[in-house]
Amino acid sequence: MIDSLDLVIDTIVAREVLDSRGNPTVEAEVLLEGGAMGRAIVPSGASTGAHEAHELRDGGDRYMGKGVSQAVTHIEERIAPTLCGLSALDQAAVDAAMLELDGSDNKSSLGANAILAVSMATARAAANGLGLPLYRYLGGPMANLLPVPLMNVINGGAHAANSLDFQEFMLVPHGAPSFREALRMGTEVFHTLKGLLKAKGMSTSVGDEGGFAPDLGNVEAGEILVEAITKAGYKPGEQISLALDVASTEFFENGRYAFDGGNYDSAEMVGQLEQLVEKFPIVSIEDGLAEDDWEGWKLLTERLGGKVQLVGDDLFVTNTKRLQQGIDNSTANSILIKVNQIGSLTETLQAIDLAGRSGYTSVISHRSGETEDTTIADLSVATRAGQIKTGSLSRSERVAKYNQLLRIEDELGSQAVYAGAVGQGPRGNA
């Protein structure tokens, strides 16, 4: 029998480690009285929304200003004394104590990277202390839904040094019977795509998220993806569809969108996206308009909301206040969930809960600067989100999440349900 005292936080340590781009990030370890330990590493984004929680960096010359030694110090000298003695089982109380200690609106005092590292490590320590896998600890007995992966196989925008304006072109293998088969389908298309790019004399180097980064236009990227799906032996729109992350805030200036040689106002931008949906089997569009273009977003939702999943990333930044504003204005129909946008596990779960209660889907997501940490894989199953975005089929920091989902599916056995097989993947008319 587990003694509740064994689950009390005893020690918290932190260190500066590296992410997949070679930039420093924060790792925390939470040790409990009974000897259980949880470790977590926070990710970092390249295309960050203006409304995200504050990621604390040191500045100065060290690591070209990107060091996180200050965040590490905050954990060991401020957060640890506050949390030691609390039960790791009370995640809400642990996170609330850190938010109170920080005292700012955007976690700029302690740093969202410091708070999140401890928040995630606490959950893992509690799970380990109880002898439970993380997805079961966070999700309870109903945590059995494996997500449809949105696989970013062509990278552009802020994630790659190429001519593509849109940031991500993704495969969505919703027609698979299981997660394992979905992963196989996506992998086969990924390798087929590489062959097609090679045959056309295009680059097969990869971007931050493991996808290819050829010099293509947005329409050309869609065309070669459909070609790859077909050549791999699958039916576009029936077995594998497409998803886009437009990341339009990155090319929005003075009220206009400049991409592919054109310059568009909000209504014209919506028209451009409508044309793409008509041309390709697209089931999901993320950040189709800029983060503060609320009127444009409303128009986009009116025109395409009944056909495809419209995901707010920079628009909502995993923030319940921003999400509620979107719900009140009938804006978008889905939220991208990035734990480091809001900076604590409790607030992340609150955003997912609000989305679900309001008829919005949730897509659990990585960041472009990732690590070997697999928390988001467990989180996607724990919350029954039904969708995960964790990059392409290369680079071990991406594949780590897919491999963890394979383990979870095996562990669940006959209880495992693949979201695509029960119609719980992205919305769409494909």
Swiss-Prot record:
GO BP, one annotated term: glycolytic process
Source taxon at top rank: Bacteria
Residues at which (2R)-2-phosphoglycerate binds: Q167, K338, R367, S368, K389
GO MF annotations, alphabetized: magnesium ion binding; phosphopyruvate hydratase activity
Record's GO cellular component terms: cell surface; extracellular region; phosphopyruvate hydratase complex
Cofactor: Mg(2+)
Catalytic activity: (2R)-2-phosphoglycerate = phosphoenolpyruvate + H2O
Subcellular location: Cytoplasm; Secreted; Cell surface
Pfam families cross-referenced by the UniProt entry: Enolase_C, Enolase_N
Binding site for Mg(2+): D245, E286, D313
Pathways per UniProt: Carbohydrate degradation; glycolysis; pyruvate from D-glyceraldehyde 3-phosphate: step 4/5
Listed CDD domains: enolase
Keyword field: Cytoplasm, Glycolysis, Lyase, Magnesium, Metal-binding, Secreted
Cofactor note text: Binds a second Mg(2+) ion via substrate during catalysis.
UniProt-listed Gene3D superfamilies: Enolase-like C-terminal domain, Enolase-like, N-terminal domain
EC assignment: 4.2.1.11
Keyword Magnesium: yes
This protein's record includes keyword Endoplasmic reticulum: no
InterPro entries in UniProt: Enolase, Enolase-like_C_sf, Enolase-like_N, Enolase_C, Enolase_CS, Enolase_N
SUPFAM superfamilies referenced in this protein's UniProt entry, alphabetically: Enolase C-terminal domain-like (SSF51604), Enolase N-terminal domain-like (SSF54826)
Family, per entry: Belongs to the enolase family.
Role: Catalyzes the reversible conversion of 2-phosphoglycerate (2-PG) into phosphoenolpyruvate (PEP). It is essential for the degradation of carbohydrates via glycolysis.
Stored HAMAP family: Enolase
Protein name: Enolase
Native source species: Parasynechococcus marenigrum (strain WH8102)
